Amino acid sequence: MKEIIRNLVRLDVRSDVDENSKKTQELVEKLPHEVLELYKNVGGEIYITDKRLTQHEELSDSSHKDMFIVSSEGKSFPLREHFVFAKGGKEPSLIIHAEDYASHLSSVEVYYELGKAIIRDTFPLNQKELGNPKFINAINEVNQQKEGKGVNAKADEDGRDLLFGKELKKNLEHGQLVDLDLISGNLSEFQHVFAKSFALYYEPHYKEALKSYAPALFNYMLELDQMRFKEISDDVKEKNKNVLDFKWYTRKAESWGVQTFKNWKENLTISEKDIITGYTGSKYDPINEYLRKYDGEIIPNIGGDLDKKSKKALEKIENQIKNLDAALQKSKITENLIVYRRVSELQFGKKYEDYNLRQNGIINEEKVMELESNFKGQTFIQHNYMSTSLVQDPHQSYSNDRYPILLEITIPEGVHGAYIADMSEYPGQYEMLINRGYTFKYDKFSIVKPTREEDKGKEYLKVNLSIYLGNLNREK
């Protein structure tokens, strides 16, 4: 536990408030180490500060200055007057004001914000847990609780009053069944239920209230605490042994990319550096157009019939390709890695206006079955360079909101490619550039329902690809 705390918690306090920082840290230390490991695994950081929250570096930008947040009790507060906040997104962090936390109500708020961070920002809980039948069944039991027996039984609202937010109580009638579609359409409301249950379970003075008024959600949290948090954490560790996958988390991805490819970058020539930067700007289009047109080959004297100006432009592109090849041949990816790429229906030779895979946020299942039937197990040679990202949907220009298909690509150790974001004109895309000439195989097609706010309520088609190993050692 000490090592996890040391790697996860950052102290930003003066020496005269050190006692309060210790008491604040003790709140965190009471949680299962598996919970903290899951948060750390996605690049999450916990800051304990004696500053006003909006003065902390994580929250000092203008978007947080006048923000209002909602407490576990549904009350709205200006962020600048509150004492804890879980910042979500691709670089999650929890900022806690250093206090003695003698008030149990304050402790509940700290655990509530951490519970939000766990269910909203932490993989795989943020993708799967709200759709877990155990969670759904527990919600339904609480929503169907009754006082008394038989015909005289009446609705027991205690569990709903304790855990459901105002909007959920208004939209979900007592006794109404909850299903995955309802959860997908009301993500923040059900994240609140999880976070509130989490907070009451781990704050000792409120644990009994959760058990008395919402026994099904108490038992759900009990199972998570005693068994499933550990199982989930162990599963993540095991998968990370086999393949590196940063999901949406940019802080960890950027750190790995910069450190792993630092020596490679230092050994590039000026011409190689220039073309990498140029490729991330306007040069990628003519380069890849040339490679697609000639199936990845540089054809001698191909511009023989062109005028002098056109011939010179063609030779320039060919030299750029040679420099880019030389740069990427110097680099090999050091471990099995998952990268991401958003595409349109054109990936499968379909035009949007003719095919329209997604309508009103819903993926057409029949068209997915058609694509799977035609392409699963098939291979294709990527004659041009492939731009991918270390993280899913790093920028709104390439996101689920615009492109209905996500390629999740497994890159085996030894493939020629490099992290080029710190050399790019668009560093926020966290680009991994994969060398040309590899053969890719379509492995799996699956429809993903929206489980995160970033999905904009839209389903998308996830297509798993891998590099065909028989082609791994192909040299240019």
UniProtKB/Swiss-Prot annotation:
Subcellular location(s) of the protein: Secreted
EC number: 2.4.2.-
GO cellular component assignments: extracellular region
Active-site residues (renumbered): 341, 387, 398, 431
Binding site for NAD(+): 280-292, 341-344, 382-384, 398, 431
GO molecular function annotation: glycosyltransferase activity; metal ion binding; metallopeptidase activity; nucleotide binding; nucleotidyltransferase activity; toxin activity
Biological processes annotated in GO: symbiont-mediated killing of host cell
Spans through the membrane: none
Domain ATLF-like: 2-226
Domain TR mART core: 242-470
Annotated keywords: Glycosyltransferase, NAD, Nucleotide-binding, Nucleotidyltransferase, Plasmid, Secreted, Toxin, Transferase, Virulence
Keyword Nucleotide-binding: yes
Keyword Electron transport appears in the UniProt entry: no
Predominant subcellular localization, coarse grouping: secreted
Signal peptide: none
Functional summary from the UniProt entry: A probable mono(ADP-ribosyl)transferase; it is not known which residue is targeted for ADP-ribosylation. Upon expression in yeast cells causes cell death.
NCBIfam families with a match to the protein in the record: ADPRT_certhrax
Name by which UniProt lists this protein: Putative ADP-ribosyltransferase Certhrax
